[in-house]
């Protein structure tokens, strides 16, 4: 299984999964034309489309792809809207011949139905986990997102993480602000700046790397927790409240409008 990044829209990535005998699948096609061009350039045949969630920038290329390749579309059962032909429940597995076996993990938070797709040492995580960051909580609760991030953290350290956007440099700026003495973040900033200057993606990343640099996976680290408490003006916070404080802190840092805190959804 060979995985290629296809940049689309302003900062999205479509992941092209190349298997044997010219078979391929794509994850989260936000556009069709660049994906079709890359499939043709590599002389491949599209066998399936995989979706992590329903946002348009991850699925608005489905129609154009299916007009050329009438293939099945695998996606979250809780968001099985227009395009999903094969809804996936939590822990459901499916096989794509000559490509691989995939398992769906329900990872809500960014959306209520969001899934991540796990296969052969790779995790396609959509907008749940970014390198040095995580998705905004448009529908899910802090409890849900933290549980999703903890679940992804249980993957082996060598797992490669394929996220949906090129957000790494911006995320690292906040990570360094929150943890100024974290040398792993400083080194990663250098590496990402070099990669981006060369026109290369900053992702995939590894779970091992994310545990060192991603503040949203590190809320229980004493030094970061102290910074979160100081920012909140509090002596004690639950893990979910600490996560939410950190998420809002990053939104303030990025000058983004604050989202409401949603109640736990079951």
Regions found by a protein language model. Name each.
Residues 1-44, 115-129:
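Conserved beta-strand hairpin/beta-sheet module of binuclear metal-dependent hydrolase folds
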Residues 9, 23-24, 31-105, 191:
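Active-site HxH/HxHxD metal-binding segment of metal-dependent hydrolases
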Residues 16-18, 93-118, 123, 154:
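Core dinuclear metal-dependent hydrolase active-site scaffold
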Residues 17, 28, 53, 65, ...:
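Divalent metal-coordination and catalytic microenvironments
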Residues 26, 73-75, 125, 162:
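Structural detector of well-ordered beta-strand residues that form the stable sheet scaffold
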Residues 29-31, 54, 78-79, 110-111, ...:
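Active-site metal-binding loops of divalent metal-dependent hydrolases
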Residues 133-159:
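Active-site-adjacent loop/tail segments of enzyme domains
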Residues 150-160, 169-266:
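Accessory terminal helices/loops
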């Amino acid at each position: 299984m060979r995985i290629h990044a296809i940049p689309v829209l302003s900062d999205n990535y479509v992941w092209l999964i190349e298997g044997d005998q010219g078979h391929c699948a794509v994850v989260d096609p936000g556009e069709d034309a660049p994906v079709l061009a890359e499939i043709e350039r590599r002389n491949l045949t599209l066998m399936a489309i995989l979706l992590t969630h329903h946002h348009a920038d991850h699925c608005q290329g489905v129609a154009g792809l299916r007009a050329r390749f009438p293939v099945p579309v695998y996606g979250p059962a809780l968001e099985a809207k227009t395009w999903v032909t094969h809804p996936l429940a939590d822990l459901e597995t499916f096989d794509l011949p000559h490509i691989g076996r995939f398992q769906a993990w329900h990872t809500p938070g960014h959306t209520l139905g969001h899934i991540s797709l796990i296969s052969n040492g790779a995790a396609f995580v959509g907008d749940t986990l970014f390198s040095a960051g995580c998705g905004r909580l448009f529908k899910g609760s802090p409890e849900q997102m933290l549980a999703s991030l903890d679940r992804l953290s249980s993957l082996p350290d060598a797992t490669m993480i394929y996220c949906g956007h090129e957000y790494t440099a911006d995320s690292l700026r906040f990570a360094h602000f929150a943890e100024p003495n974290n040398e792993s973040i400083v080194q990663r900033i250098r590496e990402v700046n070099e990669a981006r200057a060369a026109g290369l993606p900053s992702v995939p990343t590894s779970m091992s790397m994310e545990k060192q640099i991603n503040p949203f996976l590190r809320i229980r680290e004493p030094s970061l927790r102290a910074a979160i408490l100081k920012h909140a003006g509090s002596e004690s916070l639950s893990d979910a409240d600490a996560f939410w404080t950190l998420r809002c802190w990053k939104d303030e840092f990025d000058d983004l409008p604050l989202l409401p805190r949603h109640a736990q959804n079951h």
